[in-house]
Amino acid sequence: MKNTLNFLSSALMVALFMLISTAVSAQTTRDEFMSKWQNSKQFTLDVLDKMPDSGMDYKTDPAAMSFKEQIHHIGNAMVGISQGYLKGGDPGFTIDLATASKADLAAFVGKSYDYAAATMKALSDADAGESIEVFGNNVTRRQVMALLMDHSTHHRGSAIAYLRVEGVEPPAFVGF
């Protein structure tokens, strides 16, 4: 009987340790992601800041988005995808791109990053791991979070190419 109790006590302690370490690991992973998210926000704002006002409407091709549209698209997609797939509510802000100044666009993008961050942080671990259909694919909300990071990186990279074509040295990449 004593051996059985010792075994059960040990098994319970191991199970409890595994449960706690899993929860800590999930939180650490999310914290690391959010740290990188803030880095992405700052880098995007730095890219926007580098473009002179005269280059905001520059397009690499008539069918392409302008620099201003690329940057707007980063923020607008964050808001839309966060609302549609990450359980985000009304962000409480919008922008009229046609009349927006560079400062207005920077404020919009900053708020978009903050809104998406708050939406992601509000997801429970169960919600983050839930599989949902997104653009015809069955993915978890964690994968949608990664999609937002990839999407912003893609369009920020395009914006950096626009800077170079305009003869502007882009900001240095900061990984962390």
Where are these regions (language model features)?
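Bacterial Sec-dependent N-terminal signal peptides
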Residues: M1-T28
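Short hydrophobic/aromatic-rich motifs at helix boundaries and adjacent loops
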Residues: L16-M18, Q27, L86-P91, A103, ...
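Residue-level signal for pocket-adjacent positions within structured domains
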Residues: L19, M51, D127, E169
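Short, contiguous alpha-helical
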Residues: M34-Q38, Q42-L45, D53-T94, E133-F176
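Acidic/histidine-rich alpha-helical segments that form the ligand environment
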Residues: V47, A100-E133, V139-H154
